[in-house]
Amino acid sequence: MTSEISCFKAYDVRGRIPSELNQEIAFKIGAGVASHFSTKSVVVGYDVRPSSLDILDALARGIASHDSEVISIGLCGTEEIYFATNHLNTDAGVMITASHNPADYNGLKIVGSGAMPVSIDSGLGDIKSIAESVAYNPNIKPDIKDADIRDAYLDEILSFINVRNIKPMTIVVNSGNGCAGPVLSLIHI
């Protein structure tokens, strides 16, 4: 049975929790991602929203329903998912975030291998069609593997500058409610 999933937008998935995006829908989208990309592995990460861990659990079950490995980099920024998709050589990456939307929303940003962003015209529409036809199975138990990519990510960021050319200074950064704080606190130049 096909039922319309309304949280698909032009470049990502966003919806109010739980009416437009919930565990059942996240499961179906996870299955859609795994099916569309014929994945062997998918890297996932999430932001600080209260619903992110529930969405992660359901998304991982959906991905696992297609015998795909789920690799979590944990709490992170969207840019870290782009990096991890390349660095870990996964078939896809999914960031659980609703970006600037209100607190009662959450969403998913999806990239293919090589960290290629997916839009409604380049795969997101296909993922939506697959997700709408998937049967929800909350009993699947995903084997989520954790990966720490922070050191490699920092090395990549710092490779763009010559730190010897930077004069010593003190910089104060407030990442607000964003996820850049853990990365920024590791940078000591």
Model-identified regions with their sequence ranges:
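An N-terminal, well-structured beta->alpha segment
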Residues: 1-61, 65-67, 146-169
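Residue-level signal for pocket-adjacent positions within structured domains
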Residues: 2-11, 103-106, 113, 122
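Active-site flanking residues adjacent to catalytic metal/cofactor-binding acidic residues
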Residues: 11, 46, 96, 173-176
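Conserved adenylation A10 loop of the ANL superfamily
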Residues: 12, 188-189
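Ferredoxin-reductase
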Residues: 37-113
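Gly/Ser/Thr-enriched, mixed-charge loops and adjacent short helices
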Residues: 106-187
